[in-house]
């Protein structure tokens, strides 16, 4: 019922207890309980005080009394913080609609009656969407436990078919493929959740979408030590995520490309502050960034009519070939 903009006086608390809970209490009881809550320190209760002079019942002399007023609960989250969390849930591409509603209701309960947030559009937002993996939260719990205890996991990985439903990935023999994985980190980017791990057959880093994982189990076998996986020791997660904008695994390269100045904002959106610019003629800039080579190639496709890849030469040739392949699709 309260926040910093909607505090309550002791009298209002008395009235609320009576009208909402059929509890009749006197002012002294309200004051005593408020002081207990405040002195306990467990409850985030803020308040103001005002001075009142009243006669002593025995002596008749005026006495100074400090009155608690303007009492309110200081919530853990501000409304703007709570709205940010709820927006993140609402527009997540991995969380099924039913789970979104449950989470949003729980988050909304962290505020008060004055907090306004409408989630009425969730169903319409998701209604035409593909089938969602309902095992996502269970997968997160299992992976969290496995990472904490340094254990391997096994799971099935899924891909969408033309029916917009998830289907187990198959091996070359047409049988369902089972993955034995060494898990290390869970990360989120672009509204999707990923597992940074190692596929046990190899010694490099791999990524898997959490919403594509099903039938996950923890194994009794310990995961590989990080020093057995190439690039995992001393891994800077923040930098790693900046270099892997689409979460392809593989090596990172120092990429250079020319772009018009009006694309600088878009470039910074993707590559953050890790990109450096050098001004060129004709309102162009030379951008330099360390990035996963496959991610860079995919990003360049979006702007193939505006940017020119310069280095490395192999990446420039790959981008050029992408344009030729795209053109061939439209030739008779």
Per-range role (PLM):
Residues 234-332:
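Polybasic (Lys/Arg-rich)
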Residues 5, 152, 192, 281-288:
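A generic structural signal for beta-strand entry/edge sites
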Residues 1-91, 174, 180, 327-332:
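Short, basic/aromatic recognition patches that contact phosphate-bearing ligands
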Residues 50-54, 187-189, 280:
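Short beta-strand micro-motifs enriched in acidic
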Residues 67-76, 198-201, 290-293:
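Secondary-structure transition/turn motif
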Residues 63, 154, 194-196, 286, ...:
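General beta-strand recognition
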Residues 127-256:
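Core beta-strand-centered patch of the WYL/Sm-like small regulatory domain
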Residues 70-167:
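Bulky hydrophobic/aromatic content
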């Amino acid at each position: 019922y309260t926040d910093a903009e909607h505090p309550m006086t002791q009298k209002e608390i008395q009235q609320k207890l009576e009208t909402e809970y059929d509890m009749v209490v006197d002012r002294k009881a309200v004051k005593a309980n408020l002081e207990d809550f405040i002195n306990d320190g467990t409850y985030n209760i803020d308040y103001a005080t005002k001075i009142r002079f009243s006669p002593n019942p025995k002596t008749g002399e005026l006495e100074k009394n400090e009155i608690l007023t303007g009492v309110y609960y200081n919530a853990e989250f501000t409304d703007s913080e709570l709205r940010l969390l709820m927006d993140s849930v609402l527009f997540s591409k991995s969380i099924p609609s039913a789970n979104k509603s449950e989470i949003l209701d729980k988050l909304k309960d962290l505020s008060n009656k004055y907090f306004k947030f409408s989630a009425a559009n969730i169903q319409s937002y998701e209604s035409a969407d593909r089938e969602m993996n309902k095992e996502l939260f269970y997968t997160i719990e299992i992976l969290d436990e496995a990472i904490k205890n340094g254990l391997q996991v096994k799971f099935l990985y899924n891909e969408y078919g033309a029916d917009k439903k998830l289907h187990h990935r198959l091996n070359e023999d047409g049988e369902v493929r089972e993955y034995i994985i060494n898990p290390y980190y869970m990360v989120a980017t672009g509204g999707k959740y990923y597992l940074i791990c190692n596929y046990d057959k190899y010694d490099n880093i791999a990524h898997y979408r959490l919403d594509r994982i099903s039938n996950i189990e923890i194994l009794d076998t310990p995961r590989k030590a990080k020093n057995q996986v190439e690039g995992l020791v001393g891994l800077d997660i923040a930098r790693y995520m900046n270099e892997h904008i689409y979460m392809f695994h593989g090596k990172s390269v120092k990429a250079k490309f020319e772009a018009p100045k009006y694309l600088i904002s878009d470039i910074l959106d993707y590559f953050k502050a890790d990109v450096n610019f050098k001004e060129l003629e004709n309102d162009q800039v030379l951008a330099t960034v360390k990035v996963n080579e496959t991610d860079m190639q995919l990003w360049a496709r979006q702007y193939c009519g505006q940017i020119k890849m310069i280095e490395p030469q192999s990446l420039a040739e790959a981008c050029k070939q992408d344009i030729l392949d795209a053109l061939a699709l439209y030739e008779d």
